[in-house]
Amino acid sequence: MSGQAAAAPVPSGIVVHAVSRVLELQYPGGECFRVPFELMRVYSPSAEVRGHGPGQETLQTGKREVSVTALEPVGNYALKPTFSDGHSTGIYSWALLYELATRQDALWREYFDKLKAAGVERDAPMPADSLPRGHHH
């Protein structure tokens, strides 16, 4: 998932559906997608989820009930959600949001395959050693 496409469409409308836990993205021309908060959270572009390079990713679990509690624009190119579990360091470019919206089936399969390979349940709590504690270099 690159999240970096030169011609990424910019949503013309964005709606946070708190009860159904989805972000609705409306695009010029009539396209409309509903991206589950859980999918957004497990594919967060933040360093604490993605790591600083290949193989450093942290598999996210226990995010099925996560909500978006705040949503801030980042310039004219991205959104920064704050999730109910306290995660707020992911900056979601228009390209990444469009990828999450249009590749949901494949991304869910990839996520479930990673869970299975790790022998972890989707709703398992995150291990204490992988919880965010700030950023250290």
Segments predicted by a language model, with ranges:
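Motif-centric detector for short Cys/His coordination patterns
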Residues: 1-137
